[in-house]
């Protein structure tokens, strides 16, 4: 006789199978009424025997209580973005870069997929069960959207099949099919509710609902396209084979995937998909081209925020014609003056566009643009609106006059020889530059001052409370409570965040200064090379050029910034008066360091409880170690934290020395 547990297990298995048939394969196996009957039977059994209820039951997709806010999630493996190609020439340039880096003239095998126009998400499965879902966020930190993702029936709450890793992080895209989007908007129109401009906005808005019961009513689906974290298991060494493995475990994968063995194969796939785009039933904005071999992917590696082995080959953006009403000039944080066309509003690719960038004076001259002209507007990459051409010059059209003085502060505008950008010379006396510089300084990747949003910065500058980054640290809770929507508790939280932000790293400090052309990766290279602020400030251009990824242009920007007396004074105030500080960066050759880690290739795996992974990495590097992300025959040492998986197993298989976190701390001298 069948036991109660067996009956419940059987019902769950049936329902999961029917969900997969319906939502993933689009091939319903039973009538809706039969599915509803089985679901009702399972709900009754679980209600009568709550001790048998599990979190991966099909009944648990909907019903979680509304959240007050989304929890932040730090990605254990960063979710990187992709570089773009917008035409055949830039795609062929990508292909050549890959061949050159691999030192091969042979045609490579690429796995080509659709570039879905939705929201990138991460799904973490432990022992086959979905335990967490998160947005991509900034690639390092996202938001926990588990309760909402559990309502998407295309996403299995438990994986099926064999050889499922202990921990598996799947990356993919949540999106809304066009039919569901149109039906949802039609219902909203009839009810006098908000309608969404396009399916992407609808998908993003649905996933960011604090009440998962609302998300459950939205017609969302999902395709997976890649792997993040993998522990306690193995995956094939081909991207295509990995997609097939995902499918075998019950994860939805697009059927428009092809292995291409030459550039002509890739272009054929691109043009076929472009032709089929209107009939797909969901929005895409291009195709993604990935080197299929994992070995070659590892050889190619990454640049700062994107892999070298993949590119997003975008479709030509959608275009519309409209009228230029006016041209205004915006001032950025580095003083760059950008002309912006104010347009007769027009719908382009599902978005109402009323402004478009004109880039610079040369672009206005190239276009021959005048105020009143009829122009072609394009959303480049389907995102940033820009003016492409003039199609009709109106009677009475007015010339665009580029300002000789800053429209914000009145300072002179200059154009440096060799640069196309005109800049305000006002520096931090310019309100626009001041706002931009302060917003950059407090941003997450810079000093990461929690609670210091754009609207607060705008008020601080408008009220003349803050004129430079150093003055942020002089703010009091009393002064902050004078700002709009800033109560005593919020004000104190900002003051506390400012105090906390004084403890930073040399690399973050350099990035926060907002030196032109110095991004995160360049700031990290400068910090590692010079070690101290004094050494960097004394470096001439020839010395700066010796830093990895720093060319003559970047070196000139760094030197010019540091030569400016007002910038040097702000740096002095930040360090000496405000007390911004960071751990010493010791720049010593590995062979000169007396440390058990000196000159060793070290891999960290599992969860650390004493130090964060970033802190451990910095400490090891300071002692001359090279910290790698993967185990190979070249690895000297593996440091295993809790729940260490496949890396630990591989290290043991290769006979590599393994220590735990406690031993690492002892060797660090703690």
Curated annotation (Swiss-Prot):
Gene3D superfamilies named among the record's database cross-references: 5' to 3' exonuclease, C-terminal subdomain, 6.20.10.30, BRCT domain, DNA ligase/mRNA capping enzyme, Helix hairpin bin, Nucleic acid-binding proteins
GO cellular component: cytosol
Cofactor(s) this protein cannot do without: Mg(2+); Mn(2+)
Coiled coil: none
Annotated NAD(+) binding sites: 32-36, 81-82, 113, 136, 173, 290, 314
Alphabetical UniProt keywords: DNA damage, DNA repair, DNA replication, Ligase, Magnesium, Manganese, Metal-binding, NAD, Zinc
Residues where Zn(2+) binds: 406, 409, 424, 430
Function text: DNA ligase that catalyzes the formation of phosphodiester linkages between 5'-phosphoryl and 3'-hydroxyl groups in double-stranded DNA using NAD as a coenzyme and as the energy source for the reaction. It is essential for DNA replication and repair of damaged DNA.
Family per similarity comment: Belongs to the NAD-dependent DNA ligase family. LigA subfamily.
HAMAP family recorded: DNA_ligase_A
Name under which the protein is recorded: DNA ligase
